[in-house]
Amino acid sequence: MSLNIAKDSKKRVVIVGGGFGGLKLANKLKKSGFQVVLIDKNNYHQFPPLIYQVASAGMEPTSISFPFRKIFQHRKDFYFRMAEVRAVFPEKNMIQTSIGKAEYDYLVLAAGTTTNFFGNKHIEEEAMPMKNVSEAMGLRNALLANLERAVTCSNKQEQQELLNIVVVGGGATGVEVAGVLSE
């Protein structure tokens, strides 16, 4: 497999990650004289500040997910490839992805964040992180399943356990989730 992008006379900027940083840079490079290649494991950009709305069923995933190809459909200097980066070879100006190798003149790593459990293995094993739409949908489905089971549960202690929710994390997402659940 290969990325199937012909090298032309323009210098190539490879951007790994289509979050806020990668998307902003790809937009800034419009008409800059560079060939821009965006690589992301998803074929869409997600709007993280509203992921809690997907988890709480306040919004659908399509409301906060925007296909890269649609965003950049009129760009002749832009290429998108859905892949994961496996290795970076700076001495060769090359990366290895899940679909092949890509050469670059400039490489920007904007792959985003990961959930920090601060070494707490119990939370890491039991928690449901919410960094993307898939995780938000998993949380939504778990919450709704527990609510449905609680409605038909005759044992009050079991019912309370099904309705007991712990939010770990006091950042923006944690506060938003706690707020929307309390409503």
Each language-model region and where it sits:
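FAD-binding core/adjacent interface of flavoenzyme oxidoreductases
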Residues: 1-12, 79-166
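Beta1-alpha1 glycine-rich phosphate/pyrophosphate-binding loop at the start
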Residues: 2-78, 165-166, 172-183
